[in-house]
């Protein structure tokens, strides 16, 4: 009987995989390109895959990463995920389908890999085993999500979702359902190639139970600004504390013309137990960005520009002591930008990236200095 059940389960698994492949067939032939010349033609350039993102396994032994390929004839691109050991061995492809997918990340226990995909029709969270098998949908959130991040203890998930705050022309004139007009009476009504549509990205917190994400709590309820900030902001602007009890994020809590002309964003800490939000960068008038918590919970570091309205200011590192509430300008004597902050495991150093002599290099700042 057990053998019959096992065989049935295997058959169902292969049926599910086959159906998924039929629904989202790969548009990229994953064969090795054989170059017959050292001339870099447009066709050769477009045949190369572009690495999009990566995540290191909790045990530090392997890396999962995304590669985007393009099909010139179909004028389409396809992203797939790969895994490789940190010593460069055992490379394997985990996915091979044309559904939109991004945000690949390891679960804190290292047993599964999560990402966002539109495989179900809208963007939702999915998980698979480290070998690419046992793909499962994790979330069934109304209207979908745009990203998510596991808490360090693996018990909760924060996810991002668009929330309607402002009224649109259809709300005001419900007798004109087919109208495509926009009512504009203030800035900021458009950012580059994107219209302001009355929807704002908010942070939701959900329990993560039995590998499922439930409808979460909106910690920014009623707020008419985006978290993360547009146009460049991503999930890196939002991070968990090491004890999974707090969330740090950066945003610009302004509206209208003030939002359009100011770059004065702030760093906020949200406490899950008290549901209170604290501004820890108050008095800093420039662009505060991408806060990260130290593993020991003692510090929060972020990048900062000094002056409001000046988008080309030097990007500095500030470190906030969660006990004393003091802030330190860490890179005061470093005459370059600093980005991509990462704490060392012992919380004694911060690694960051800076451009020097037309190259991007990795630097380290030691707190003891």
Language model feature labels by segment:
Residues 1-25:
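Bacterial Sec-dependent N-terminal signal peptides
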Residues 22-39, 75, 201, 206-208, ...:
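Blade/loop signatures of beta-propeller domains
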Residues 24, 48, 67-80, 95-102, ...:
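A flexible loop/linker signature enriched in serine peptidases of the S9 family
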Residues 29-68:
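Mature N-terminal segment immediately following signal peptide/propeptide cleavage
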Residues 58-59, 108-109, 152-153, 242-243, ...:
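Residue-level detector of Asp-centered blade-edge/turn motifs that repeat once per structural unit
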Residues 60-63, 110-114, 157, 247, ...:
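Hydrophobic beta-strand positions that form the internal "hydrophobic ladder"
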Residues 85-89, 129-133, 208-211, 271-275, ...:
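Short loop/turn segments that connect beta-strands within beta-propeller blades
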């Amino acid at each position: 009987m057990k053998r019959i059940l096992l065989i049935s389960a295997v058959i169902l698994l292969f049926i599910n995989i086959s159906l998924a492949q039929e629904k989202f067939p790969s548009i990229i032939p994953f064969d090795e390109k054989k170059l017959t010349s050292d001339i870099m033609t447009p066709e050769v350039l477009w045949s190369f895959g572009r690495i999009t993102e990566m995540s290191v396994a909790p045990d530090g032994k392997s890396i999962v990463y995304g590669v985007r390929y393009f099909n010139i004839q179909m004028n389409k691109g396809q992203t797939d995920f790969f895994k490789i050991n940190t010593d460069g061995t055992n490379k394997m492809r985990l996915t091979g389908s044309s559904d939109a997918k991004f945000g690949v990340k390891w679960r804190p226990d290292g047993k599964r890999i999560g990402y966002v995909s539109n495989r179900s029709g809208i963007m939702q969270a999915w998980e698979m085993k480290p070998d690419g098998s046992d793909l499962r949908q994790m979330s069934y959130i109304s209207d979908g999500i745009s990203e998510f991040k596991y808490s360090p203890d693996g018990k909760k998930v924060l996810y991002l979702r668009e929330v309607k705050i402002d009224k649109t022309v259809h709300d005001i004139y419900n007798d004109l359902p087919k109208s495509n007009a926009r009512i504009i009476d203030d800035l900021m009504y458009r950012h580059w190639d994107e219209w302001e549509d009355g929807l704002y990205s908010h942070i939701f917190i959900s329990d993560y139970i039995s590998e499922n994400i439930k409808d979460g709590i909106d910690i920014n309820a009623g707020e008419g600004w985006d978290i993360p900030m547009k146009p460049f902001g991503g999930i890196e602007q939002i991070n968990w504390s090491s004890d999974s009890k707090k969330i740090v994020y950066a945003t610009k809590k302004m509206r209208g013309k003030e939002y359009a002309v100011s770059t004065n964003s702030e760093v906020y800490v949200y406490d899950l137990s008290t549901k209170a939000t604290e501004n820890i960068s108050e008095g800093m008038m420039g662009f505060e960005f991408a806060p990260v918590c130290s593993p020991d919970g003692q510090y929060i570091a972020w990048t900062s520009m000094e002056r409001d309205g000046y988008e080309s200011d030097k990007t500095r590192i500030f470190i906030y002591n969660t006990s004393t509430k003091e802030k330190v300008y860490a890179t005061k004597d470093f005459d370059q930008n600093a980005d991509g902050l990462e704490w060392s495991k012992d919380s004694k150093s911060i690694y960051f990236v800076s451009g020097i002599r037309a190259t991007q290099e990795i630097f380290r700042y030691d707190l003891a200095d």
